[in-house]
Amino acid sequence: MSAVYTLASRPPRPLVPPSYVNPAQMQNAQAGPSTAPSGPKKKSSPTLATVKRKRTDTPEGNSPGSPSPQPQRKGREGPKKKKANRACFHCQKAHLTCDDSRPCQRCVKRGLASNCTEGHRKKAKYLLDEEELEQLKRSKSSAPEIQGNVSAANTADPPSVPIAEPFPQNDSLLTASFDPNFSFGSEAANREYSILSAILGNPSPPESASTPPPPPPPPQSYATWTSDAIDFIGSPRLGTATSSYTSPYGESMQADTTLSTSPGNAHYLTYPYPQSQRSEDLVDMSYASQYSSAGQGQPCLPANSRPRSPPTVFLHNPSSKDQGSRGLLSPPPSNGSPSSTSSAPSGIAEIVRPQSCGSQLQSINDRVLTPYDYTEGYHFLMKHLPTRFEKNDILRIVRALAIFRPSLIALQMPLSLDDEVFVEKCFQRSLVELDKLMSFSGTPTVVWRRTGEICLVAPEFCMLTEWPMEDLVHQKKYIYELFENQSVVEYWENFASHAFENTTQSVYSHCVLLKPSGAPVPSTFCFSIRRDLFDLPSIVIGQWLPLL
C-alpha cells in the first residue's frame, strides 16, 4: 500500500514527443555544438545539373529560345577544286583559279577552248640567263620599229611631209649590253653607266648624200669641233660614249692609243676653264675661232670622206705644267695631217695612256717607297716665322704648336717604317679622290698637309688669288705663306684646338689672302681636318669665298 501511495503522490511529468534523428546525419555528424544551424540549407537539384550538361543541337549563335534561328549552312557539294600548278593564259590574266586540264573548265564554259594555252610566268630579271636577257631586249627593241612601220603605212599626210624613219634597232638604249670594262663592282651599275653612255653618245640616224646639211648648231655644240675630234668620238672603237658627261671615274679610266675603248674606258670630261689658259697654250687650237665659226655653219661630210688622224686624248697629268686644265678635255688640232698631233705644244697637256683605277693605284704603290718627312715642314716654319712676324705673334704660334705636337710625337713613336709608308700611300690615294671631288665644285679649294704644304689646288683658287698653279704645286709652297699675318696666327690656333676633335665638323673663320703683288683678298674661310688610320691629322681641306 505504501508503494502505491508513493507513486500516486508524485506529480505527473510532461510528455515530450521523441525527436526524429536522420541516420544519414548521424553518419556525417561532427564534434561541436549540439544545436543545428538555424539557416535553411539549399539542396542541389539534380534537374539543374542535367540542364547544364545538356547540349543543344542548334547552330552557334542561336539559343534555343531565340525567336528567329538562322538556317543551317549547306555543305559544299562535290570535291574541293584543286589549284593548278600553272594557270592558262586567260585565267592568269583574269586572276581566276584554273585546273590542270587543257582546255580548262573555265575556258570551255567561256567558249575559249581553242585558245586555252599555258600562261607565261614572268621571271625576275636578275634570274634571267644571258640568252633570255638578250631575247627580252630584242623583243622590246623591235616594238618601236613595228609601231613606226604601222604609222608610216597608215598615215594620210601629203607626200611633202617627211615620214619619220623607224628607230634603228642598233641605236636602241635597250641594246646597250653589259660592258665588263666598267669597274663599278656591280653588274647593275655597269649596265646603268652603259645606258647613260648610250644616251649621251648615240649619233643621229644616217642621212643620204643628197640630204642638205642641217642648220648650224648652237655655239657649244660638237659640230664646232674639228673633223679629227668628231671621228675620234664617233669611231666604232670608242663605242657610243662621248666626252660631255662628267664622271667621277673620268680621270682614272684613260684610253689607250689603240683605243679599244667602249663606254667603259670612255673619258667623261668637260671643257677647260678659259680663264686659266695662257696665250701659248692656245697655239693651233684657238677656241675663239672655233666658236665664232659655229655661226657660219660647217658642212657635214661623210665619215669616210673626212681626213683622219690618229685619235689622241689630251688629259691632265699631275706632272705637267698646265694645271689649269686638270681633268679636262682639249680637242686636238684642226688640221688633218697625221703629224699635227706631234706638233702640238707640250705646255698644253701630255698625251696620257689609258689607265684604269686599279693601275693608277698600283702606280701609287710602286712610287711610294719611303715615308714622308714631316719634320722638314716644321723646320721651314721655324725659319719662316722670324722673317715675317713680331715676337708676340711668334709666341702665339709656338704655343699653338706646343698644344698638338706632343700628341703627334706620341702617336708616331710606335709606328714602324712599313706603317709610315702605308700612311703615305693612303694619303696619296686620298688625294686622287679629292682631285675628282674638286673637279665637281666651283668653290676655291686647296688641300694641304698638316705641316701646311700645298698638295692640290683648284683653278678657282688661282683665279681668286692670281697665283699661278705651277708656283703653288710644283715649288713646295706652304698655305700660311698666302695668308696675312693675323690670319696665320688664327689658323694655327684653330688648328691646334681642332686637330684631335671631331673630324665631321669644320672650322669657320675670317681670312685675308695675299696676291703675288701683296694685295689683300678678304674672304671667309673654312677648313676641315681628316685623320689617318692611326688617328694622326693627315689632310686639311680649306675653302674660301671672297667678301664682296
Swiss-Prot record:
Record's subcellular location: Nucleus
Superkingdom, taxonomy of origin: Eukaryota
Keyword Nucleus: yes
Amino acid composition bias (Polar residues), ranges on this chain: 22-37, 141-154, 240-261
Pfam families assigned to the protein according to its UniProt record, in alphabetical order: PAS_13, Zn_clus
One of the record's GO cellular component terms: nucleus
Function in brief: Transcription factor which regulates nonfermentable carbon utilization. Activator of gluconeogenetic genes.
Protein name: Transcription activator of gluconeogenesis ERT1
Lineage, opening ranks: Eukaryota, Fungi, Dikarya, Basidiomycota, Agaricomycotina
Gene that encodes it: ERT1
